[in-house]
């Protein structure tokens, strides 16, 4: 293992976060800490993961898209952000692409993603 990968592994271990195995096409629920004045609360943001960048390293991020009041909303979350309380996989999607940017131009039934019924987690 080279020096940079070793430093990354140490930083990830120091954070002590458990990141579930998810990919583009999966519907996920992100518990994100929101600070309003002096109060801090956890806000759930649920949508389809349309991309993952930089894998599962310390600099990794993922984009979640949802339709809110008829308008498409996307948020990019850093994978190891201290503001992320939890990441939960709601359902597994079956897609053939790593980046689902084509969903931006689709609405309704054409934007649906088939559920992956026989998903096998990596060992």
From Swiss-Prot:
One of its GO terms (biological process) is translation. One of its GO terms (molecular function) is structural constituent of ribosome. GO terms for cellular component: cytosolic large ribosomal subunit. The keyword Magnesium does not apply. Keywords: Ribonucleoprotein, Ribosomal protein. This is Large ribosomal subunit protein bL19. InterPro entries: Ribosomal_bL19, Ribosomal_bL19_CS, Ribosomal_bL19_sf, Translation_prot_SH3-like_sf.
